């Protein structure tokens, strides 16, 4: 509904989801990759156990790309060395709903006004017998205030491979890394102070992920047009 774009979607407009059929699904993994937190050396100390949990557990979600999304990324008419920007709404979808710390539970997603920067740029690296290799890079910065303030600031890099004959993406590897702070309402136990957060994206090895909507899809309109 165009009337709700540009502001938060009221709760009564968030369901049922009326899910679209995704053209491409990516697995999304999150991991607390480094912390500066000092913990008690006592093995049974709760902080020590939580620190171990943060360092060894991985959050999982799924990024859905629609037919429109993949069409705007289509490199078939692009030349080697050509650069272009991914649509802003797609960069914002990734920033708001997927660049989050969901290692310990369901995260609070960033709001529309929380995204200070979200941009992605692509470049064709090579074309060989119908296979196009693409580099993607970008940057992001989100800050959420309120009772559970969080922040994530960093860069995203990756490699994409597209088969022009089958018209399918055969590789879609992205890696976002940056500095994060804070915890969500349902993600207690985040490291104190700042910590490094890593979020990785890839095409799943099977079709199981296709059946599982992204957590952010509970806010369908915001997810598709953030």
Regions found by a protein language model. Give the residues of each.
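Acidic, serine/threonine-rich low-complexity disordered tracts
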Residues: 6-226
């Amino acid at each position: 509904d165009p009337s709700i774009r540009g502001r938060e979607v009221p709760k009564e407009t968030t369901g049922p989801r009326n899910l679209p059929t995704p053209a491409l699904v990516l697995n999304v993994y999150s991991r607390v990759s480094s912390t500066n937190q000092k913990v008690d050396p006592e093995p049974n100390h709760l902080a020590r156990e939580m620190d171990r949990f943060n360092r060894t557990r991985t959050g999982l979600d799924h990024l859905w790309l629609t037919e429109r999304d993949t069409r705007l990324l289509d490199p078939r008419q692009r030349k080697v060395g050509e650069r272009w920007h991914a649509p802003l709404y797609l960069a914002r979808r990734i920033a708001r709903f997927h660049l989050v710390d969901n290692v310990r539970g369901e995260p609070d997603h960033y709001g529309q006004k929380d995204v200070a920067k979200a941009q992605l740029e692509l470049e064709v690296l090579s074309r060989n017998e119908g296979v196009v290799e693409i580099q993607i890079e970008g940057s992001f910065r989100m800050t959420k205030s309120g009772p559970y303030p969080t922040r994530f600031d960093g860069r995203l890099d990756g490699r994409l491979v597209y088969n022009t004959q089958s018209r399918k993406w055969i590789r879609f590897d992205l890696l976002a890394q940056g500095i994060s702070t804070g915890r969500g309402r349902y993600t207690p136990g985040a490291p104190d102070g700042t910590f490094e957060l890593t979020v990785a994206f890839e095409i799943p090895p099977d079709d199981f992920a296709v059946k599982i909507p992204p957590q952010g899809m509970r806010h369908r309109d915001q997810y598709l047009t953030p």
